[in-house]
Each structure stands twice: as structure tokens, then as C-alpha cells.
Amino acid sequence: MDLLRILDTKPIPTIVDATTLGISGNTSGDYWLPTTMSLYQKELTDQIVSLHYSDILRYFETSHYKEDVILESMKTMCLNGSLVATHPYLLIDHYMPKSLITRDVPAHLAENSGKFSVLRDLINLVQEYETETAIVCRPGRTMDLLEALLLGNKVHIKRYDGHSIKSKQKANDFSCTVHLFSSEGINFTKYPIKSKARFDMLICLDTTVDTSQKDIQYLLQYKRERKGLERYAPIVRLVAINSIDHCRLFFGKKFDKNSREYLENVTAAMVILRDRLGTLPPDLRPIYSQKLHYLVEWLENPTVPWPLPDIYPLKQYTSMDVERSLLTEVHFKKSDDQLEDAFSNCSKKRGRHGANKAASSTVAGIEDNITPSFYSTKRLKNDYYTNPLKQDMTQLTGITTADNSSNVNYHLSSGIITHKLIQSMGEVYMDICVQKQELDDYSCLDDLQNDHLKFFSNEDEKIIKEYETVLRTNNENLNRSHELEVENNLKFSQIETLEKDIETLKGSLMAQGETLSKLKDAFVKTDNVQDEIEKEERVSVSRDTEKKYMEQEIKRAVDAIRENEEETHKLNEKQNGLESELKLKFEKSEISTKELNEKIGFLKKELKLENDLNEELVGQLSKTMDNLENLTIPRVRTQNGNTKKKSRAKKPGNV
């Protein structure tokens, strides 16, 4: 047994009990598992905030910005921060491996993301059981990285988006199956679930998973009973502590996710908490150093309470807090645990560190100290090899006679001016100009502020007077109520005494004999008869009113009947007039029809005569044409040549 090796190894911290952790006994089925963040993730988050520095200030300090531009910038910052909180390769792909199926990729992915490291430890525990685990995350590259991480575990992977980084899946006999679903656009018709058993756990990798959606509810209730404690699969949300995911998860329960308050609180918390990204509380660190073995009992029986505390609450920060945080430079260390740093810097064997032992024990303290520049340690203090006595240039040259008692005005008294001194002088002068301008602005606004002060002082006095008036009225009301209460008590006591007197009088009357008892019965009967009379009078009054109402209704009905009869008579008269008009028009139309028929007969006769005449003329024309065809035409002989000569000879004589 190598005792030296055992003593040199890092001691395993003990896990504190549940009471110290602040466990609330949560059995809701929706749990959060905080994760750490790598140094690369922290630096990227700080750079994202720095890139949006001006937009953040404009968003929190002013109200006249372009809403679409600034709001889109804030949403882009939150989206990029959420991507980095999951894995830095989702935003920066410079160091992205060319192939995601090589053997060293899972360890490399877990090293650069605290969330992937915790997920790997959780899957290492789950793979020891015969379980069906569902993981939901963003579609695209997130699922590719998640599949590449799971290739390093002994699990069977089933992906439901139609893609895979591995073209061929080898057959294996792993007992644990991990199902990968995208948080957007799950199509169970195209990609049905390939599991005959229910899901034992649903892991949400990022904040895009909405467990109230219909598809996610289907996964939670898949193959489960509709009633009972186990009708839903337990949900485990992996959330990087103090990151944008933590802010969204916490403030999403307090505000509407589309409201301005939600965006303001999430953005402010992201900016202010960037120096505490992924920093686990000391009570939780032993759980993660032991690879989450603390959760084995819950994994075996998910019905027991969640063994970790609920989500840590966050403050609602103001714009002043955001501005102060933006002016503060953030420094990150590789590890927040000094014991972890000490053991990582020491060698595994005792004989190897030797003289560096003292230096290695103070590594954490050295990292916190910022190394001063050359100008602040040497030249500005006159500490260089040509000036062993550390005398200033005034004493060495005798040229300048300025007062050198203060180190602040060194650049005014020394004979040496460096580039850094010139730059610092320029910055100081610029700051002085800005301060002078601000002072002038404040001087200009002094009268306005005095007016504001006077106005608010007057308002304050008015409010104080109103308050005093209301207070005085309240006191008077209290006194009056007290007096009324005293009077009521006196009257109550008087009523009690009168009731007692009445009882005594009744007793004395009963003791006097039957006559008084008969009088009492008669008095009671008289009282009852009086009540019945009053009741009958009320009934008669109500009947009279009802009778009047019915008479009015009958009168209205009679008037309505009379009006209807008059309208009916008018309509009958109008109908008779229309019928007579129609008869006259029918008679006129019959007369015109007879005349038209006579004209038509006359025209038909004339048309027949014309047709006969036409036929006769056609017959004559045909005879004439036949005669013309039979007629012989005589032929005339002409001498063409002689005729032409004679005509030519006659021309000169005629001329």
C-alpha cells in the first residue's frame, strides 16, 4: 500500500445532510439540477455582454431609443447567452471537431461545457439500470453535440428528427435507451416512438422546452396510467447556475415571457451575475465532485422527494445596479475551489515538486494579484539601472525647478515624457473637460432643479395638510363612534331593564287570576285579528292595482282592434279600386287586339296579291330570257388592215 500516494490525492469531501442543504421535500415531478460552467463559457458570456454594452445602457437609461433595434439586440444577447450556457460550440465553431464520432470527442465536449459534464455524470448513473430516458433540446447542432456526447456512454441512442451523425448504428445489448427529441416541431406521425415501455425520466437540456405543450405532455404520459402519483414522468431541468437559463427559469414563473418586465429582469440579472457564472454553493460541491452519486436513491425510486434544494431565488436589479456592473471588470479563474487548484498544481508524487512546494501553495493568491506594468514599477519611480540612487531628473540635470513633492504631478516635473504618460495626460484632460461640461450643465439646470424643489416642497406641504385634515377627521370619527357606542350600551341596558319589568308585570298579571288571563288572551286575539286585517288590506290593494292594470291592457287591446279594422277597410277599398282599373285595362287590351287582328288579315291579303304579282312577273321574265336565248345575232365582217390605212391617210388632209 502506497501511503504517500494516498496522502497526496485529493480528499473526498463529505456531503452535508438534507437539513443543511435546505431541501424542501419537493415531489411535484418538475425538478432543477444546477450545473457549473467552464472557463470558456464564462469568458464568452462576458464578451457577449461587452458587445452589447451600448445597447444595454440605452435600454436601461433612456426611453427614446428605437424600440425594434434595441429590443432585438437584447433578445439576441439573451439567445447567444443561452446557447453558450448549453455549449460554447453552438455559438463559436472555431474549435468544433471536424468529426463528431471519434473516440475523444465526448470527453472534449464535456470538458468545455459544465452542463454536458453534469449530463454525462447523470447518464453514467442511469446506464446501470434498464431504463428509457428521454432528452429534449434545441433542434439542429444541439442534438448533434448531444448525440456525440452520448456515444461515449453505454446507451442505445434513438433520435427522432430524421438525422444522425452516425450513418450506421451497430447492434448493441445495452440495457439503457436514450431517446432524443427536439423542442420544436416533433412529428410523431413521421417518426413514431420506438419504445414499448414508458419513459422513466425526461431531461430538459435548455430553456426552449415548454412542458405545457401537447407533444411534451404526450411524452410525459406515454404508456402511463391516467391517474395516480406516477401518471407523469419526472422532469429534470439542467440549468447552469446564475446563467441566463437560471434567470429565465426563475423570472418566467413571476412574469409573462412576452412582457417588458420579464426582459428587463432577465437582462439585468444576466449582466450583474456574470461574475458568478456557474459558481455552486459550497454545500453542493461535494455532490458534483462525487459524480452525482448522491442522486442514486432518487433514481431508483423517483417518488421520493427531490434530494436537492429548489431553484435559488434571484433579486430584481435596478438600472443603477446594471450600470455599476458594466463599469466593473470581471476576472475569472479556472476553478473556484482553492483545494482543487492546490491539488491540480501539485504533482501526484511527493518527490517531484521539491523547491516549488512553497510556490504552489500560494497559486490562488498570486492569480488574484494583477501584475503591475513596467512604467508603474520602474520608470515612474526612477528605479532603473542608470539611476541607482533613484534621483529624479530635476536633481540629476538641474534644469526643471518644479515642485516634485507629489507623485501625482510627476509628468509635469520630470524631464521624461513617455507615450504612456502622454496617453494618461490626454485621458486626464478629457476627463477634466467632461467633468467641467457636466458642472456647467448642472449649473444651467440649477434653477430648474430649484423650481422642482420648490414645487415638490409645496406639494409636500399640501400633502401634509391634507394628511393632518384626514387625521383630524379620523380622530373625530373615532370619538363620535366611541360616544355612539356608549349611548348604545346605555340603551341596551335600558332595554334589558324594561324587558325585566315586562316579565315581572306579566308574572303579576298571571298571578291575579282567570280574568286577567282572559284579558290577555283577548288582547292576543285582537292583535292577531289586526295583523290579518292589515294583511287583507294589502291583498286588496294589490288586487286593485292589478285590476287597474288589466283595465288599461283591455283598453289598449280594444284600441288596437279598432285600428286594425280601419286599416282593413282602407285596404279593401284600395283593393276594389285596383280591381276596377284592371278590368278597364283588360277591356282596352281586347279592343286593341281586335284592331290588330283586322290589320294583320288585311296585310296578309295584300301580301298574297303581291306574291301572285311577283310570280306572274317571274314567269314573264323567264319567257323573255328564253326568247333572248333563241334570238340569232348577225355577224359583221371587217378588214383590219384597210381600215387602218384609210384612217392614216385621212389625217394629213384633215390637218
Curated annotation (Swiss-Prot):
Q: Where is this region: Disordered?
A: 635-655
Which InterPro entries would you find in this protein's record? HDA1_su2/3_sf, Hda2/3, HDA3
Q: Where is the composition biased (Basic residues)?
A: 643-655
Q: Name one Pfam family in it.
A: HDA2-3
This protein's UniProt keywords? Chromatin regulator, Coiled coil, Nucleus, Repressor, Transcription, Transcription regulation
Q: Which residues form the signal peptide?
A: none
Q: Name one GO molecular function term.
A: DNA binding
What does the record list as GO biological process? chromosome segregation; negative regulation of transcription by RNA polymerase II; positive regulation of transcription by RNA polymerase II; regulatory ncRNA-mediated gene silencing
Q: Which residues form a coiled coil?
A: 482-632
| GO cellular component term of the entry, any | cytosol
Its localization reads:
Nucleus
Query: What does this protein do, in the record's words?
Result: Required for activity of HDA1 histone deacetylase complex. The HDA1 histone deacetylase complex is responsible for the deacetylation of lysine residues on the N-terminal part of the core histones (H2A, H2B, H3 and H4). Histone deacetylation gives a tag for epigenetic repression and plays an important role in transcriptional regulation, cell cycle progression and developmental events.
What family is this protein classified in? Belongs to the HDA2/3 family. HDA3 subfamily.
**How does this chain assemble?**
Heterodimer with HDA2. Component of the HDA1 histone deacetylase complex composed of at least one HDA1 homodimer and one HDA2/HDA3 heterodimer. Interacts with HDA1 and HDA3.
Additional detail:
Present with 1100 molecules/cell in log phase SD medium.
Protein name listed in UniProt: HDA1 complex subunit 3
